[in-house]
């Protein structure tokens, strides 16, 4: 197989890959920003201040009164992140073969939001599993140590997998003798 290394903004690269790799990629693994606000070399904090969010979304009526009260639970913490991940997942889906699969790493901050977006992009019926893996423990947590992360798995087309009887697991030798 040929290897390809492309450096650039991932959205631009995904758009570029559409030309040559549309429907040709068997498996994709992505590890997107977790929206934690930590100091990484890439943007990992997609929150806006309450005033920025209110201004952008037209959250005041004609008299200048706020149209919602609880600024800590509104979309300003997720809207930009959702827009960022949604567009990239759509482009990634286009690259997958009909029997292709995507794995997406995430932590507890956005796993539920990501699942909702993936259900829309890939379809709920194409959901395979939510894998939970044990991460390293530093034993420096203030209250409780979160020691796992998630990997969401989706088929591009589960119906294609069924119709073509594609097997992900094979029976182990001797298993029939045990259960006979």
Label every model-predicted segment:
Residues 1-180:
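Core catalytic lobe of class I
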